[in-house]
Amino acid sequence: MEWTRTGIFITLLVVVCACTQKNKTVTDAEPDRPEAFANDDELLDYIQKTHFNYMWEGAEKTSGLACERIHLDNVYPQQDQDVITIGGSGFGIAGLLVAIERNFINREEGVARLTKIVDYLAKADRFHGVWPHWLHGPTGKVKPFGTKDDGGDLVESSFLMQSLLCVRQYVKDGNEKEKALAAKIDELWHGMEFDWYRNGDQNVLYWHWSPN
């Protein structure tokens, strides 16, 4: 009798596993990805365009900034599809400048996106001028990185500001819209209270600070 029960259990387990595999959908991340490239320049173009598209087509809709993650199956067990990465957005913003130079987008399109980003950052949560590690895209409110990490992240914000300063230099002598963008970046830059993150007169910079 015991063997019969064991056999039935194994049979049911196999059936369940088979059904699960049958219903599972595997999404090809890049169905049109070329299998070979004619030369190194073509490969480099492909890599740069793919990197750029994460920030361009894959950006969080409200902010224009980089998502912490993109799941191609659109399944987010932690409901974090709207989470923005501040440091990663810095890398993406630098990529937008490359995209303009490489004519992946025109300058006007790039400036419009960058202005949207900067306007969003000016309204989003900051802690003595410093952004948190993560933001909730639709609201601009802090998304805690950990139990005691719900405030400013100086390292991630520095990655972000490095790229914004590159943007500032790129547009500061341009047309009126570009000069206005550079001025907005200046305000954000000068608003970062690096001295606060020294915790007094200590000869250090604190990575994180939370009001809690």
Where are these regions (language model features)?
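Membrane helical hairpin/interfacial module
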Residues: Q81-G90, A94-D149
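Well-ordered alpha-helical scaffold segments within catalytic/enzyme domains
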Residues: E30-L43, N53-Y54, G90-I105, Y120, ...
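Bacterial signal peptide processing site
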Residues: T20-K22
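Extended ligand-binding clefts on enzyme/binding-domain cores
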Residues: D41-L44, G129-S158, D173-N212
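C-terminal motif of bacterial Sec signal peptides marking the signal peptidase cleavage site
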Residues: V15-A18
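Long, well-ordered core segments of solenoidal/helical folds
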Residues: Q48-G64, A112-G129, A183-N203
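Bacterial N-terminal signal peptides that target proteins for export
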Residues: M1-I8
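Low-complexity, Ser/Thr/Pro/Gly-enriched N-terminal "stalk/linker" regions
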Residues: D28-Q81, H128
